Amino acid sequence: MSAIFEILDKDAGGRIGKLRTPHGIVETPTVMPVINPNIQLISPKEMKSFGAEILITNSYIIYRKEELRTVALEKGLHGLLGFDGPIMTDSGSFQLSVYGSVEVTNEEILGFQQKIGSDIIVPLDIPTPPDVHFRRAEEELAVTAERLEAARKFIQGEQLLAGPVQGSTYPELREKAASRLRDLNFEVYPLGAVVPLMEAYRYAELVDVIAASKKGLSPTSPVHLFGAGHPMMFALAVSLGCDLFDSAAYALYAKDGRYITANGTYHLEKLNYLPCSCPVCSKYTADELRKAKNKEELLGKHNLYATFAEIRLIKQSIKDGKLLELVEQRCRAHPKLLDGLKRLYTHSAWLEQFDPATKGTYFYCGPESSFRPEVLRFEKRLDRFSLEGSAIIRTAPVKGEKDYDRVLTFKAPFGSFPAEMEEVYPFNAEVPKFPDYETLSTALSNTLKLMELNPGAEFTFICEKEFEHPLIEEIGKKAKLVYRAAWKKE
C-alpha cells in the first residue's frame, strides 16, 4: 500500500499525521490500548469514548486458544473484539522475550494475522534485550532480518505490514537495521525491545535508540514505540518522531491500585485528593474511589482519560510550535527523564532539519533550552551577518546608540543580532532578564564568534553587571566593554 502516511503538522521531530488503514484513518500521534482477549477490564467498544482510534491485541494469544481462534477465523478479528476501527496485532514476540520460545513459526503467525483481518500485521521478530553482547545482538538481528524479508514477500495487498527495528542498545545496529528495512518498504516501523529501558527509567539510552533508528528510516515513515504506555514520556518520544504507542498500563496499573498522571504515578491508597478533572475524578473523591466496588474499572478509565488527555495536549503543542516547551516541562517530573532531555539535545543538529523555520514564540524553560534546534540554527547562520564600521551591542536600548553604524541586541541564549530583528522569530523569545550560566555561555560564545567573523567592525558591548562569566573577559579583548550602570548618558 502506498502513501499510507501523510504528515500534516511538524514541530522538532514531532508530527501530526494521518495513517490510512483498511478500517479507517488514524490521526497520530496516538495510543493503541492493548486488549487482552481473555481479560477485558474495559471493553473494546468503549475505547472510542476515551479517544482511542486504533487498538492492539496479541494474535499469538488468539492463535493458541482454540475458542478464540475459532471465533476469529469465523467472524474475523474485528468481530471477535467487537470493534469496527483499525486493529494492530502483535505476533508473539513479547511472549518470546518473556518465555524464550513460542509454539508458532513466523509464516504461521503471519498467515493467521492475514486470515483474521488484522489491519497492521507484525512478523515474529527476535526482541533482543538491552546490554547483551554485541555478537548476540548482531546474530539475532540477522535472524530478524531474514524473517522480515520473508514477511514482506508473504504479505501483499491492503493490510499494512510492520517492520520491527531491533539492535539492542547498540545505536549502530539500530541504524543499520532501520536502513535495511527502509529499502523493504514496510508501512509501519515499530521500535522493539525497549520496554526494559523504560521500566528501568533509562531514558537517555532510550533517546539514543529512537534517534539511531529514526536516522536510518525515511522521515516520512510512521514509527511505533513498542510497549510505551505511560504519558509522562510521550512528549519526549514524540519530539524524536514517534507516532504510535501502545498501552496496557491503563489496566495493569489499575489492577495494582496505581493512578496515572502526565507527571508520574500515584498510589490510590496514598491520595487524599484526585488531581484530575476527568469524568471519573469529577464524580468521585479519593476516598469514594478507594471504596468503590468497581474500583479497578474506574481507575482503569481514569488512566485512559489521563493517557489520551496528554496525547491531545501534545498535538496542540505541535500545532502551536510549543512541543519542546512541553517536553522540557514533562522531563522535570523525574531526574531520569531530565537525563533523557539532555540526551535529546545532543541530537539537536539532526532535529534541526525537521524543525520549522518559523513558529510560536520561543519560551525559555531552563538551562537545557539553550541547546534547542533553533539556537543551533542561529549559530550556524552567524556568518550571514556582515558588519562594518562601529557596532554597539546592548541588552536594551541605550542613549547614543544612533551614533553607531550598526545596533545589535544581545539576548541569551542566542547571542547578538541586528536590533531590527527583535520582534522576529526566534529573537522575540521570552527569556529571564538574568540568564543562567549555561544559557549565558551559549550567548556569549555566539557573540564572540560573530566578532571573529567581522574583524573589520569596531564593537562596543554593553551588558548588565550581573553577567559574571569568564567569557566576558574574552569579549573585553575584542570590544569596548561597558556595564550598563556605567554607560555615560548622553
From Swiss-Prot:
The keyword Cytoplasm belongs to this UniProt entry's keyword annotation: no
Taxonomic classification: Archaea, Methanobacteriati, Methanobacteriota, Stenosarchaea group, Methanomicrobia
EC number: 2.4.2.48
Residues where substrate binds: 125, 193
Residues reported in the UniProt entry to bind Zn(2+): 276, 278, 281
Protein name per Swiss-Prot or TrEMBL: tRNA-guanine(15) transglycosylase
Gene3D superfamilies per UniProt: Queuine tRNA-ribosyltransferase-like
PANTHER family the record matches: QUEUINE TRNA-RIBOSYLTRANSFERASE
Active site annotation, chain numbering: 90
